[in-house]
Design a protein with these regions (language model features):
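Extended terminal
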Residues: 1, 185, 220, 224, ...
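N-terminal type II signal-anchor transmembrane helix
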Residues: 1-32, 317-331
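Amphipathic hydrophobic-ligand
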Residues: 33, 56-68, 95-97, 105, ...
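Flexible beta-edge/linker motif
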Residues: 41-98, 105-130, 232
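Short beta-strand micro-motifs enriched in acidic
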Residues: 43, 69-73, 93, 152, ...
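Transmembrane beta-strands of outer-membrane beta-barrel pores
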Residues: 87, 169, 201, 246-248
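Elongated, acidic membrane-bridging lipid-handling scaffolds
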Residues: 105-211, 286-288, 293, 298-318
């Protein structure tokens, strides 16, 4: 026991003396970003604790705990039994050229792969600034990020991994604006998967620029977004089945807008696709690869358009005819009012 205690004290002394400078220098050397941390300590049975880690413009966390595997080290592999990150805050930026502020890690020589057996994120935060959508940076904030990813312990060679995650969207008033949830399992050996991703009761305005081809973002005042993606993979072939639903959509009127305004027309046009309860739903699916997932946007737009057509086809014909007639009438009245305005100006 005395030997273990002495070794523990020696390791902590070494980390306090050299660990901080070593970790900072490695981060700055590999990520090309300014880094800082408060202290580094050694814990039992075997863990390295980093307090107040910060990487300029990208990441900061109250604490990072790393538990390496001794057996993996003896086998010549870098295996982390667990990585726990408490209260991380990530700032992700996309520029006008669709490039992100993620650092490029240059591989020098053939470095051994790092295998992660477990990851836990507690009370995280993501700030996404999208300068491709808005030159000033459209801001999406996600709070209360909690992630739990764990590889099964037996058999040791298995790559079967369970995962679950949750997060809360935040609106412009810093209030909760919906929830994101993910759960399931993935086996990296045969490349199989069974999982689900959900957006529940998200305020439609929060993500409005990303579906403005469906709902005009500038006119959207309020509404709810729900989305479910069922992900199933077998031998690397991944099928994603999606259900997208908008409800309680309300368009705000700009100053001076009255009856048969542009806002009303947007609402009526969208209403053609809605069911009896006023919900607009799209059911669609696409195929990709589990190890290299990609989405063909052109094909996806076509798939969504087909889903919209099916949505109309599933409604009673008399309902659709009545909706189209009413909307066409309002467009005609709106066009007449524009014509009258231009006549007055002449």
């Amino acid at each position: 026991m005395l030997i273990i205690a002495a070794l523990y004290l020696a390791l902590n002394a070494a980390l306090l003396t050299f660990g901080k400078a070593l970790i900072i220098s490695q981060i700055e050397k590999n990520l090309y970003a300014k880094a800082s941390l408060e202290k580094v300590t050694f814990g039992l049975p075997l863990s390295i604790n980093i307090d107040k880690l910060s990487i300029e413009g990208l990441f900061k966390a109250d604490s990072v705990l790393v538990s390496p595997s001794i057996m993996g080290f003896l086998a010549g592999r870098i295996i982390l039994n667990s990585l726990k990150i408490a209260r991380p805050e990530i700032t992700l930026t996309r520029d006008k050229d669709d490039k992100f502020n993620l650092p490029r890690i240059e591989s020098k020589g053939k470095a051994p792969p790092i295998l992660l057996a477990g990851l836990k994120i507690q009370d995280g935060k993501l700030i996404f600034l999208d300068k491709k959508i808005d030159p000033d940076g459209y801001r999406v904030v996600v709070n209360d990020i909690n992630v739990d990813i764990a590889k099964v312990a037996f058999p040791p060679t298995s790559l079967y991994t369970n995962f679950k995650a949750s997060a809360i969207f935040v609106n412009g008033a810093s209030s909760p604006a919906g929830k994101a949830i993910a759960s399931g399992w993935i086996d990296f050996g045969p490349k199989d998967m069974d999982g689900k991703f959900e957006l529940k009761d998200v305020e439609a305005v929060v993500l409005s620029p990303y579906y403005q081809n469906i709902i005009p973002a500038k006119k959207l005042h309020s509404g709810k977004l729900n989305f479910i993606a069922d992900l199933k993979a077998k031998n690397n072939d991944l099928l994603v089945k999606c259900h997208l639903e908008f409800s309680d959509i309300v368009y705000g009127k700009e100053e001076g807008e009255g009856k048969n305004s542009v806002s009303d027309l947007f609402s009526d046009a969208l209403g053609i696709f809605s069911d009896a309860s006023g919900r607009v739903t799209f059911d669609f699916s696409f195929n990709t690869k589990l190890d290299k997932p990609r989405v063909d946007l052109i094909n996806l737009k076509g798939t969504i358009a087909q889903a919209a057509a099916q949505n109309i086809a599933s409604q009673p014909p008399e309902n659709v005819i009545e909706k189209v007639k009413e909307t066409a009438k309002k467009f005609k009245e709106f066009g007449k009012s524009l014509k009258d305005i231009f006549k007055k100006e002449e």
